[in-house]
Amino acid sequence: MSSSFFKKRLSPIKPGDPIDYKDVDLLKKFITERGKILPRRLTGLTAKQQRDLTNAVKRARIVALLPFVNPEG
């Protein structure tokens, strides 16, 4: 399979920028319409950024800034 099959998304997060759980607009860019976290191969994030993003999304869900599941999806 060709490597150009998947279109790599450019990350809106620069290396070194913090990922904050209160920045809901940023977190929504990395979540599907069903509420799932996008995989690293689609987001273009580094491994550390993906871990930080996952923790931020989970924390935002716990404090009710993001829904666990999108009922409209």
UniProtKB/Swiss-Prot annotation:
Key words of the record: Organellar chromatophore, Plastid, Ribonucleoprotein, Ribosomal protein, RNA-binding, rRNA-binding
Source organism of this protein record: Paulinella chromatophora
Compartments reported by the entry: Plastid, Organellar chromatophore
TM regions (residue ranges): none
InterPro entries assigned to the protein according to its UniProt record, in alphabetical order: Ribosomal_bS18, Ribosomal_bS18_CS, Ribosomal_bS18_sf
Domain of life: Eukaryota
Description of how the protein assembles with itself and partners: Part of the 30S ribosomal subunit.
Lineage, uppermost ranks: Eukaryota, Sar, Rhizaria, Cercozoa, Imbricatea
Family according to the record: Belongs to the bacterial ribosomal protein bS18 family.
The keyword Plastid is annotated on this UniProt entry: yes
Protein name as it appears in the record: Small ribosomal subunit protein bS18c
GO biological process: translation
Gene Ontology MF term list: small ribosomal subunit rRNA binding; structural constituent of ribosome
CC terms in the record's Gene Ontology section: cytosolic small ribosomal subunit; organellar chromatophore; plastid
Main location: plastid
